[in-house]
From Swiss-Prot:
It is an enzyme of class 1 (oxidoreductase). This is Glutamyl-tRNA reductase. Keywords: NADP, Oxidoreductase, Porphyrin biosynthesis. It comes from the Archaea. GO terms for biological process: protoporphyrinogen IX biosynthetic process from glutamate. The record marks H78 as: Important for activity. The gene is hemA. The active site is at C47. Belongs to the glutamyl-tRNA reductase family. Possesses an unusual extended V-shaped dimeric structure with each monomer consisting of three distinct domains arranged along a curved 'spinal' alpha-helix. The N-terminal catalytic domain specifically recognizes the glutamate moiety of the substrate. The second domain is the NADPH-binding domain, and the third C-terminal domain is responsible for dimerization. Homodimer.
Amino acid sequence: MQILTLISWDFKRNNNFFNQAVLNPYEYWADILEKNGISRYVILLTCNRVEIYLRAGFPEDLEAMKPNVLHDEEAIKHLMEVSSGLDSMSLGENEILKQVKEAYELSVRNGKVDKVLSLIFQKAIFVGKKVRSETEISRGKVSVPSIVYDILSSRVVQKVLIIGNGMIAGEIAPYLSGKFEVTIAGRNIDHVKDLASKYNYSYTTINDLHELIMRNDAIISATSSKTPIIRREEMVEGKLYIDLGNPRNIEDKPGADIITIDDIYSVSNRNGSARMESVDEARRIIEIEMASLMNKIKDVMIDEIFADFYKFAVVVQKMEIEKFSRMHPEIPASDVEAFAHSMINKVMNIPVMTLKSVARSQSNQDFSRIFSKFYDNFSDLVSAALQSYEGRQDTQSLRDRTRRLLQRS
């Protein structure tokens, strides 16, 4: 029996199809699932991944996009690694845990989760929090923008000048929003205006660079220039200079407070090494929580199938009560019903508890295989039992008869 299927595209694998998949909004994926009769799912969409978690079925429409496909334990383990930050571009990032939580909550609001799917995602969110609180996986910044932000925050800095409007400048700009007064400067006023307008920053050209340096506390140079942008004679004492260029954008000057891209990388590598040391510890936490979760899933699946069996027992109970009441009209029907109900509960309690105990001693694969066979044949077994019980030998569909009897109950 299928517990969970993951269909995914991400930045690590199948890049060609990922570039296509990541452009599609939530509604696109939900529409495909619904058209394929799939109603229990969670869709996780980020800049680096498209992941669709299903309880049952498989949308054949997506096969042409060559997705990664994982089933059951592998799919659940992957989700826990994602929520823990082990599968992120930046190891241990915090944002992904929030994104997993939001994806799950959206499916809850839309009525797209069942008990098993809820168990899986609630556990994954719990594991993500536990890994971060009990390991160093998220401690210490590793990205250039976050390290630059920490450096600025540790100094007496209010006004920041960013020189450049390329990729690095674009990555740093959002980190400073709301914290510093930022001006973006470059050679092309239209280009810097486009970047500055996203965050309501000031913008200008670098025609009078010395004056710009005078007006700001920290100067970040992030251009691809092959020659220095800031020369010694333009530098002002008491300013913080952060040079993210390669080659260098800022000339050396004795006594100047200059932090280079090599200094940034040194911090990143040091913090990254500390995070890597936490990976094994994080995986141990995932392994322990996986075992706990799988036992809960087994319990839920057993409860669900015995709930169907209980419905069958109620059908039989009603028939027997009717017969007994005709034979003994002097006994109140309510007393007979109470007695029968109590007997069913007591009789069923032992096999349910026993099966749960046995299930926990079986490997997850063995349990899934055995349970699938039992579940797939259950309706036929109940139908045959009903036919035998009623003593009827007609051509009516056993499955239809069972369904009607269960509805009557």
